[in-house]
């Protein structure tokens, strides 16, 4: 029986693809295990949502693009992580490693290479992240979500596969969503998502502009951990720090979304054909990958994009109004998008690429 080791972590985006793939792997008759960090979000997500999967924690450092004394310490953490990962891989003897990226994946990919275990990397963003750039040297193949990403990668190693969407995404129940929120079925619903870490600026603008928004929408506000404001209570407005199991039901009643521009999330909105106003993480908080993602979706006619630095109450309202006027066109553009691979076909390709 073919055994696949999965790795990736640090953010929800680096875990969600694996969360969508592992159940398919199991249903196809493959064995699966997960290698991640000791305290990262991947451990919480995998152990809570896939308790049947063996989770192996390893030491991991952080990849920084700037000079810091912490970099010296992290070199030793990465070396320790390679040794930890080698022990796991020698014990489990997987046939291949699937790496979703994030700093924890680098020592695992290096360890796999040292044991002649083939690695397949997945890159969700339009431009490759630092971890995947490093890991690519030790990997057999890299799969991309955006076709344009192939321009940044060696042709002999890179293949475009499209987005990997979780199975339950389209199973949301609108009736349950309305019951959960207490919303009126005859009024539009706006979902605001600031990403797993939340956005203080976006949260502030939504709250300051709530009365104006509530004239047109009912608002579901996912604030991010620790950013919920219990003092803000209005009819037609509901806050959550983070939603797991009920998210598909909330998406089932959503007409429009304001969101960060992580690729996994925006491809989910695209699959559900929900018009989106994207506010990507700025260069002061990221390498600019979300800016690229947002601009690409805007160019395709799937979304509108606003730089967070330019975000004001007036601009937010203006962009929402324009998007509502263009709603039919945006949804028609979304209908042209087709998923490249089913998950079953993806695993067939993965096994063929890794083991041949």
From Swiss-Prot:
Pathway: Cell wall biogenesis; peptidoglycan biosynthesis. Gene3D superfamilies: Glycogen Phosphorylase B. Transmembrane segments: none annotated. GO terms for molecular function: undecaprenyldiphospho-muramoylpentapeptide beta-N-acetylglucosaminyltransferase activity. UDP-N-acetyl-alpha-D-glucosamine binds at residues 166, 196, 290. GO terms for biological process: carbohydrate metabolic process; cell division; cell wall organization; lipid glycosylation; peptidoglycan biosynthetic process; regulation of cell shape. It is an enzyme of class 2 (transferase). One of its GO terms (cellular component) is plasma membrane. It is found in: Cell membrane. It catalyses: Mur2Ac(oyl-L-Ala-gamma-D-Glu-L-Lys-D-Ala-D-Ala)-di-trans,octa-cis-undecaprenyl diphosphate + UDP-N-acetyl-alpha-D-glucosamine = beta-D-GlcNAc-(1->4)-Mur2Ac(oyl-L-Ala-gamma-D-Glu-L-Lys-D-Ala-D-Ala)-di-trans,octa-cis-undecaprenyl diphosphate + UDP + H(+). Pfam families: Glyco_tran_28_C, Glyco_transf_28. It is a peripheral membrane protein. Keywords: Cell cycle, Cell division, Cell membrane, Cell shape, Cell wall biogenesis/degradation, Glycosyltransferase, Membrane, Peptidoglycan synthesis, Transferase. The keyword Glycosyltransferase applies. Belongs to the glycosyltransferase 28 family. MurG subfamily. NCBIfam families: PRK12446.1. Cell wall formation. Catalyzes the transfer of a GlcNAc subunit on undecaprenyl-pyrophosphoryl-MurNAc-pentapeptide (lipid intermediate I) to form undecaprenyl-pyrophosphoryl-MurNAc-(pentapeptide)GlcNAc (lipid intermediate II). HAMAP family: MurG. This is UDP-N-acetylglucosamine--N-acetylmuramyl-(pentapeptide) pyrophosphoryl-undecaprenol N-acetylglucosamine transferase. It comes from Staphylococcus aureus (strain bovine RF122 / ET3-1).
């Amino acid at each position: 029986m073919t055994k696949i080791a999965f790795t990736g972590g640090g953010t929800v985006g680096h875990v969600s693809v694996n969360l969508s793939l592992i159940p398919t792997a199991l249903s196809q008759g493959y064995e699966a295990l997960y290698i991640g960090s000791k305290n990262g979000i991947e451990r919480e997500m995998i152990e809570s949502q896939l308790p049947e999967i063996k989770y192996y924690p390893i030491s991991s450092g952080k990849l920084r693009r700037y000079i810091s004394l912490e970099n010296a310490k992290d070199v030793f953490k990465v070396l320790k992580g390679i040794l930890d990962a080698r022990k796991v891989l020698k014990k489990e003897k997987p046939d291949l490693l699937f790496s979703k990226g994030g700093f924890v994946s680098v020592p695992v990919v290096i360890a796999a290479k040292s044991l002649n275990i083939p690695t397949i990397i997945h890159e969700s963003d339009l431009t490759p992240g630092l971890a995947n750039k490093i890991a690519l040297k030790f990997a057999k193949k890299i799969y991309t979500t955006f076709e344009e990403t192939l321009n940044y990668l060696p042709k002999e190693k890179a293949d475009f596969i499209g987005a990997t969407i979780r199975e339950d995404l389209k199973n949301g129940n609108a009736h349950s969503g309305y019951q959960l929120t207490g919303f009126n079925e005859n009024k539009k619903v706006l979902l605001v998502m600031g990403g797993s870490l939340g956005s203080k600026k976006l949260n502030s603008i939504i709250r300051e502009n709530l009365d104006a928004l509530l004239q047109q929408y009912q608002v579901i506000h996912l604030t991010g951990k620790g950013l919920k404001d219990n003092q803000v209570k209005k009819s037609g407005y509901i806050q959550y720090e983070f939603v797991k199991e009920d998210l598909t039901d909330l998406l089932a009643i959503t007409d429009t979304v304001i969101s960060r521009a992580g690729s996994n999330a925006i491809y989910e909105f695209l699959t559900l054909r929900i018009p989106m106003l994207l506010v990507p993480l700025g260069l002061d908080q990221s390498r600019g990958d979300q800016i690229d993602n947002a601009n690409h979706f805007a160019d395709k006619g799937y979304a509108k994009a606003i730089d967070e630095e330019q975000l004001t109450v007036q601009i937010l309202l203006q962009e929402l109004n324009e998007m509502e006027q263009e709603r039919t066109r945006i949804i028609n553009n979304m209908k042209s998008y087709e998923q490249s691979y089913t998950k079953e076909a993806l695993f067939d390709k993965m096994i063929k690429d890794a083991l041949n």
